[in-house]
Design a protein with these regions (language model features):
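PRPP-associated nucleotide enzymes
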Residues: 1-134
């Protein structure tokens, strides 16, 4: 399923515009924060596609029925650029497991490149939903 977040007007357009704006993107903290915000928005949209289970919680006024995510979520990212985006996902999927890939482009003299993977840190994905959070 393909879902383009900025196809409809929303605050996402502001985040994308600031990340693309040459004058603004030099502010590394703002750039990282906008990446984190994009991770949050993306996590919210992905949450709509997950499986849910009805549960009951005890409130100060009694019991309330709520639907909660039943999928076990693993959020994976490519180090380093993806870390703020990854954090945005964790802000919403705070009980998710994490996975990391250390990779970079290794360029040859002709300008072509190969992806060099140094390591992957990931537990078992059996029966889990993997979200590859790579901006």
């Amino acid at each position: 399923m393909l879902h383009i977040l900025n196809q409809q007007n929303s605050i996402v357009n502001k985040f994308i515009a600031e990340m693309r704006d040459r004058k603004i993107q030099v502010d590394s903290m703002r750039f990282r924060r906008n990446l984190e915000r994009m991770g949050e928005v993306t996590a919210y949209e992905i949450s709509k596609t997950l499986d849910y289970t009805p549960t009951v919680v005890e409130t100060p006024l009694g019991e309330a029925a709520v639907m909660q995510v039943s999928d076990e979520v693993v959020v994976a990212t490519i180090l380093r650029a993806g870390l703020p985006f990854h954090q945005g996902f964790l802000n919403y999927f705070d009980d998710a497991q994490n996975a990391f890939v250390s990779a970079y482009r290794k360029y040859s003299k002709d300008g072509k490149f190969k992806i060099k993977v140094e390591y992957i840190s990931c537990g078992s994905l059996e029966g889990k939903v993997l979200i590859l959070a790579d901006p």
